[in-house]
Structures are given as C-alpha cells and as structure tokens.
C-alpha cells in the first residue's frame, strides 16, 4: 500500500485500470468507451479511487499515481499507442 492510500483498502484491479486511463488523460466519456461501461460506472470507480487515495482532484491524483509508481510511464504509453492507432484507423 502506498502512503496516500489512507483508507487502508487497496485499489481494485478495475480501479487501477481506470486510474491508468485517467493518468493518460482520457475523459470520463472516453474511459467508459474504452472499458465498455457507462459513464456512471466510471464515476463510481473514480469515487472509490478518491475515497481510498484521499486526494482532491484528478490533477493531484495523476501526480500521486506517477510519483507512487502506481501507474508507470509504460502503462500510459500503451494507452496512447492504442488511441493513436484507433485515430489512424478512423
């Protein structure tokens, strides 16, 4: 568990997946499309992440995720590659 996970409850696999997409810069709508879920479901995952990590916003969440190595630069690059290839295919 990292220092900011103050609730004592670790992030779920799905929350980590959502977090990676947030760090890559995707919007709630884009995350929902990427995961094949509703925006409401994404919001629920975000609420869970914010409750566990205890940060005030997505900017601080992104900084925390990178500085704590919860999300790696390689994870972000993989998301970007996927999105670029989707844009090129369109």
Positions of PLM-derived features:
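The N-cap/first-turn positions of alpha helices
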Residues: 14-15
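Short, locally clustered residues in the helix-turn-helix/winged-helix DNA-binding domain
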Residues: 20-24, 66
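Residue-level "hotspot" positions that anchor or transmit function at local structural transition points
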Residues: 9-10
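Basic, Lys/Arg-enriched C-terminal extension of HTH/homeodomain DNA-binding domains
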Residues: 3-6, 51-90
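Recognition helix of helix-turn-helix DNA-binding domains
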Residues: 25-60
């Amino acid at each position: 568990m990292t220092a900011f996970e103050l609730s004592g409850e670790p992030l779920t696999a799905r929350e980590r997946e959502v977090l990676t997409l947030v760090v890559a810069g995707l919007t709630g709508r884009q995350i929902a499309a990427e995961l094949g879920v509703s925006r409401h479901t994404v919001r629920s995952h975000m609420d869970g992440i914010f409750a566990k990590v205890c940060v005030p916003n997505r900017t601080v969440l992104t900084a925390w995720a990178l500085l704590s190595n919860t999300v790696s630069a390689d994870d972000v690059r993989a998301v970007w590659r996927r999105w670029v290839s989707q844009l090129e295919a369109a």
